């Protein structure tokens, strides 16, 4: 019964709105809201029941927020104008520096691409050697690693103690930091 009364009030409100639109030639006025008690007390059963609609129009009016999408597609030229408008001018990059090692230009807050490629190649080589020993462990190895390049003297036993020695068949690059050989 409460739902029937609520439905009647909603239908009455919608018909009043449509009548006001017909008789007024200006913009539509704000919709009327009835302040009345639909039930004696708020019933929990009315809230649990699924909403039933008398027509498709009532359903559309109730869910009008769902249809808040653009009516027409934005054309391709309009999108391109937004993207490449004259207001979007090119900005100069002012944080470029020259790499002291290889003379390449790069942003001041990053490492040079050419230098990074050299470091990446050497570390990849070291990782491959580590994985040849025990490929099932993955990145986390069971022992620490001491890297020995060709032409280097043997490290003291105290430095190598408990570590796996990886021998690389190339000279140590000048930029590759030597580990301290203190006991």
UniProtKB/Swiss-Prot annotation:
Predominant place of localization: mitochondrion
Ligand binding (Zn(2+)): 99, 102, 112, 115
Annotated Gene Ontology cellular component terms: mitochondrial large ribosomal subunit
Biological processes, Gene Ontology terms: translation
Pfam family, one: Ribosomal_L32p
GO molecular function, one term: metal ion binding
Keywords: Metal-binding, Mitochondrion, Ribonucleoprotein, Ribosomal protein, Transit peptide, Zinc
Cell compartment(s), UniProt: Mitochondrion
Subunit architecture: Component of the mitochondrial large ribosomal subunit (mt-LSU).
Family: Belongs to the bacterial ribosomal protein bL32 family.
Function: Component of the mitochondrial large ribosomal subunit (mt-LSU). The mitochondrial ribosome (mitoribosome) is a large ribonucleoprotein complex responsible for the synthesis of proteins inside mitochondria.
Protein name: Large ribosomal subunit protein bL32m
Organism: Caenorhabditis elegans
Name of encoding gene: mrpl-32
